[in-house]
Amino acid sequence: MEIVIGLLLSSLSLYCDFTDAECLVISPARLVVKYGDPASAKCTSDQPKQLGWEATHGGTGLTDKKVKFLNWSVDSVTDWNIKPTCYTEGGQCQKQLDITVYKLPDSVSMTGPSGPMVEGKEYEFKCLIQKVAPGNSLNVSFYKASAIGRKTKTLLYAPDVPRQTTKEPISGEYPLLWSPSRGDDGAQLWCSALLGLGELGPQPPPEVESEPFKLTVHSCSGQAAGSAMVAVFLLQLIHWL
């Protein structure tokens, strides 16, 4: 008998957990919103209940009457950690809206060697990205194109971006170690910051690029010839003296 009662109580508990989890539905279930843009969602109950929204912006108290739905909306999303939650009287059932707030970087720039480069020698470039969010959606890439233009761009390198737990804007420097060849003289190098926000995010994914860095590459043979000419000139000068 005790076993039967235990099974009944267990079944009832599972039923209650299921109904509590399913008693509220938020649509859309997930939002991707640009910082400063409006946002809205609808909370629906399976049965008429007193509903409310708890949020740092756009929150409401419980409705006076039992209703089957209640809307949440804000004119401008300005809280990076906003967690709008729909709930029923007594908090017996609640559901949180999954919302991602994003922001394009304030600036994307690239630094590199200040003077001409020599083919085959390794140089360091850096992509500087200022205040972009969320950091865990950031993808950084370095590209190269011929002197003609960017139509034939080639991906040089995509550095690993450390995964971020914060939802607030981040800034970072992302390095590239690269050795140019003789054919890279006159080519352009630049980097980009792309936010991969998934299917619900803007399509194509928003991307901000740096200004191009024009490459000046000297060949080893050219340098050797130049050095030889200087040496000959110095020898002749010494002979004349």
Language model features with spans:
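Short beta-strand segments of immunoglobulin-like
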Residues: P28-V33, T111-V118, Q130
